[in-house]
């Protein structure tokens, strides 16, 4: 407190010394009296200087106060946002402290169970502390940025005042330019009206010319089409007539050839007729001497005379002559028919020649008409040329007038373009300044939103850590239940061993429902009911499922050593302390005192288990039993009551399961696939295989494993996290952390106290990495 009071003393001494020097330097006429108004001169000068400085300070302070009133609204908003951020920061710190306390309590409880869990919790606590430190650093950076932005806003507001003055000057120039543009627009409108009148007259003339050209073209096309159609028709008819003429000529030539052949044939026949007549006369003379000839023939028949040959030849000749007469008559008829056809062909030929002459006359008339139309077309084309020349002269006159008007209009448009450029520049400057102001406001809003999102993300992480702690606690409680259930199974097996010691036939009675063929006394009768074979069981076991026998059945009458109740911590042994794998791998071992129901070789053949890490085939799957789930309030009914254990998934308890938990479940399947662990499906296998059942060798397992899901064809482990514990597990109420409806997909919880390595969160990508500090998570 003494230092600020001691600092102004040397400054006052220096001021007084300078004042004395100034007074000493003044002339005697200018020096004041030694005691004006009863005060020394030094005090008066000091008071005047101090008053001058006070007035300057007052003016500067008033200017600052007047200037600061303009920013009161902005400062209030920024103060509200800063207060909200500070409150959220305080809440986060409180939540972080509570979470740290919960983690510390949880670590104290879990340190007795496993040392690996403590390391994971310590690493997570360190990561949370590092994130808190990063949050504090980011908050300090935010405050520095807010101060810089306030300075920028002040500078921009001073620029805005200058821009307003420029806008006033620009508006005045704009008004003067608008007046000039209105006068120019009126002149342009008058010029456009004149141009429109010229265009209307040009359009009318062009329409008349087009109509005349269209009519001429239509007449020409119609004339050509008619001429072409008629010419095509006549060409087709002429071609058909030529074809008919050619066919008739060919038929005429063929008929003439046939006639010549027939005439030659007739001549040959007429030459043979006199010969035939002479032969006929000779035959008549021979008929008179038939009687004599008969005697001669009879006399010469035996001698083999050849008198029959000339008679047969004469008969053949007569028959041939008759046939020739018939053919001659037919040839004459054909000849007459061909002559008639030739006469008809001559008539058609004459008609065709007349028709061709008519066509030639029509063609000459059409050619004369075509010449007339061509002359008319030439006259019309000459008229069109004259009209086009007249219209071209008018167009040249109008074009000259339009060029003069267009030049005047271009000059006016250039003036207007210059004015518009000035206006556009002014508007662009205004827009740039407005954009700068908007960008600064948006950057402020983005900074606020960015840090709000960071706060929300840290709240989410805290909530997810809290959920992970709950799931870990539930996992512990479920493991305790499983251990209790396994202890109950041990007590049941001990009771069964006692029953077997008292009555060795009780084993056959309990397993007749599944393995009657393997019994030593042969299969049971078909009419015997399953309830009769369960006479030695307790009434509690008869109410529910049949008793699940232990994985290894006793061979002798003594009791085996009792180990710990958890089957996961030791390898299952038989009654004599030998592991079950010895029985499977030693097929030549002698049977026990009581005797097994089947030989070891048969047991090996019946029990074909796949190697570790592979699944059962579909045909070799053991019968499955329905799994059950016990609630937190459910108790075990008795020592001999078998129950199977099943864990519900997080999908039913806490909503949809995140993708990371599904991947961790798949990793759990891969990691635990090489281990053969007894589960709730083993009793069902024992019941199904009968008293001679021997399980496969089991490898020693260390570490916590999860219950097996036997509903599918492949044996799978349950989810890595059991259902969450009650809300009051860590001392805080369940409503302390209210559920939040965060946008987007749900975040995966931290893998707290899990057998799998923790997975890092993805980095947060900022929308504008060039402006804000780059946060490192």
Swiss-Prot record:
Residues 572-591, 662-671 have a biased composition (Basic and acidic residues). It is found in: Membrane. GO terms for biological process: endoplasmic reticulum to Golgi vesicle-mediated transport; protein secretion; vesicle cargo loading. The chain crosses the membrane at residues 39-59. Signal peptide: none annotated. Keywords: Coiled coil, Membrane, Transmembrane, Transmembrane helix. InterPro entries: cTAGE_MIA/OTOR. GO terms for cellular component: endoplasmic reticulum exit site; endoplasmic reticulum membrane. Residues 541-671, 721-742 are annotated as: Disordered. Residues 118-269, 339-498 form a coiled coil. It is a single-pass membrane protein. PANTHER family: CTAGE FAMILY MEMBER 15-RELATED (PTHR23158:SF57), MELANOMA INHIBITORY ACTIVITY-RELATED (PTHR23158). Belongs to the cTAGE family. This is cTAGE family member 6.
């Amino acid at each position: 407190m003494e230092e600020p009071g001691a600092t102004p003393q040397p400054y006052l001494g220096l001021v007084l010394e300078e004042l004395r020097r100034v007074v000493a330097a003044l002339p005697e006429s200018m020096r004041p009296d030694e005691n004006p108004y009863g005060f020394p001169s030094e005090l008066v000068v000091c008071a005047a200087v101090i008053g001058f400085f006070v007035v300057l300070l007052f003016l500067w302070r008033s200017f600052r106060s007047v200037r600061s009133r303009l920013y009161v609204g902005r400062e209030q908003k920024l103060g509200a946002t800063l207060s909200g951020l500070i409150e959220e920061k305080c809440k986060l710190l409180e939540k972080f402290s509570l979470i740290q306390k919960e983690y510390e309590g949880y670590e104290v409880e879990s340190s007795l169970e496993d040392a690996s869990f403590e390391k994971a919790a310590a690493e997570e606590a360190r990561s949370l502390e590092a994130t808190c430190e990063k949050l504090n650093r980011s908050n300090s950076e935010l405050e520095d940025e807010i101060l810089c932005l306030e300075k920028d806003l002040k500078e921009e507001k001073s620029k805005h005042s200058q821009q307003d003055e420029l806008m006033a000057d620009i508006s005045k120039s704009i008004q003067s330019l608008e007046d000039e543009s209105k006068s120019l627009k009126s002149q342009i409108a008058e010029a456009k009206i004149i141009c429109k009148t010229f265009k209307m007259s040009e359009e009318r003339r062009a329409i008349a010319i087009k109509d005349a050209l269209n009519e001429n073209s239509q007449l020409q096309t119609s004339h050509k089409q008619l001429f072409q159609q008629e010419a095509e028709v006549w060409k087709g008819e002429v071609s058909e007539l030529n074809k008919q003429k050619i066919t008739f000529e060919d038929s005429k030539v063929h008929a003439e050839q046939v006639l010549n052949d027939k005439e030659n044939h007739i001549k040959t026949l007429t030459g043979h007729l006199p010969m035939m007549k002479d032969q006929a006369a000779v035959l008549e003379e021979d008929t008179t001497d038939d009687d004599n000839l008969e005697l001669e023939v009879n006399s010469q028949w035996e001698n083999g005379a050849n008198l029959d040959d000339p008679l047969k030849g004469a008969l053949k000749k007569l028959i041939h002559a008759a046939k020739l007469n018939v053919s001659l008559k037919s040839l004459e008829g054909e000849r007459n028919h061909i002559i008639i056809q030739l006469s008809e062909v001559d008539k058609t030929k004459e008609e065709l020649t007349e028709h061709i002459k008519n066509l030639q006359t029509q063609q000459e008339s059409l050619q004369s008409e075509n010449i007339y139309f061509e002359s008319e077309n030439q006259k019309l084309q000459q008229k069109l040329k004259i009209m086009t020349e007249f219209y071209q002269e008018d167009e040249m006159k109008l074009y000259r007038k339009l060029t003069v008007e267009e030049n005047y209009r271009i000059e006016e448009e250039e003036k207007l373009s210059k004015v518009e450029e000035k206006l556009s520049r002014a508007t662009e400057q205004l827009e740039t300044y407005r954009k700068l102001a908007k960008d600064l406001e948006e950057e402020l809003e983005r900074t606020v939103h960015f840090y709000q999102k960071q706060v929300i993300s840290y709240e989410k992480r805290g909530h997810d850590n809290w959920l992970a702690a709950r799931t870990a606690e539930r996992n512990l409680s479920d493991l305790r239940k499983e251990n209790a259930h396994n202890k109950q199974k041990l007590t049941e097996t001990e009771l069964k061993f006692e029953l077997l010691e008292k009555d060795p036939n009780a084993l056959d009675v309990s397993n007749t429902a599944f393995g009657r063929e393997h019994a030593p006394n042969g299969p049971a009768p078909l009419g015997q009911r399953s309830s009769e074979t369960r006479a030695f069981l307790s009434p509690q076991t008869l109410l529910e499922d049949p008793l699940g026998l232990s994985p290894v059945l006793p061979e002798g009458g003594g009791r085996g050593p009792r180990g710990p109740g958890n089957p996961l911590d030791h390898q299952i042994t038989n009654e004599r302390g030998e592991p079950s794998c010895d029985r499977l791998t030693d097929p030549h071992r002698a049977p026990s005192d009581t005797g097994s129901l089947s030989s070891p070789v048969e047991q090996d053949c019946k029990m074909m288990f796949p190697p570790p890490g592979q699944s059962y085939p579909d045909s070799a799957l053991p019968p499955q039993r329905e799994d059950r789930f016990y609630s937190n309030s459910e108790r075990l009914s008795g020592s001999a009551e078998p129950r199977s254990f099943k864990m519900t998934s997080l999908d039913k308890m806490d909503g949809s399961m995140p993708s990371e938990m599904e991947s961790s479940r798949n990793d759990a399947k891969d990691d635990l696939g090489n281990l053969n662990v007894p589960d709730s499906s083993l009793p069902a296998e024992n019941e199904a295989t009968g008293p001679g059942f021997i399980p496969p060798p089991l490898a020693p397992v260390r570490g916590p494993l999860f219950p097996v899901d036997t509903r599918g064809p492949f044996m799978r482990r349950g989810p890595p996290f059991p259902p969450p514990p009650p809300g009051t597990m860590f001392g805080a109420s369940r409503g302390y952390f209210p559920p939040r409806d965060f946008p987007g997909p749900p975040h995966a919880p931290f893998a707290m106290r899990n057998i799998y390595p923790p997975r890092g969160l993805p980095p947060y990508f900022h929308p504008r990495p060039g402006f804000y500090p780059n946060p490192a998570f």
